[in-house]
Amino acid sequence: MPPRLLELAGAFGLQVHRISVRNQRWRWGSCSRTGHICLNWRLVQMPASVRDYVLTHELMHLKQMDHSPKFWALVARACPDYEAARQWLRGYARNPQGTPATS
């Protein structure tokens, strides 16, 4: 994951200062104001498109720290299919032992 994060950061003209991968229970990732991005190790189990969305989401926090409309506009520009990835994550959260639950 860190190599892909750095690849995406370069494509977006962003600089990540530190990357860590952890066993997080409630978050897929986080980004600090100092450029430290922390990722959940479980991302490796997810489809590449979902993983890329999470990485992109965290990278966009380097431009906009909150989840304001401006932030979501940045995410939408960088990852046009982000809604599908968010839906997948919601399904995974309901059924983490297997494939996402469908409604």
Q: Which residues does each predicted region cover?
A:
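Walker B catalytic acidic pair
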Residues: 58
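Active-site-proximal or metal-binding-adjacent scaffold patches in catalytic folds
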Residues: 1-53, 62-103
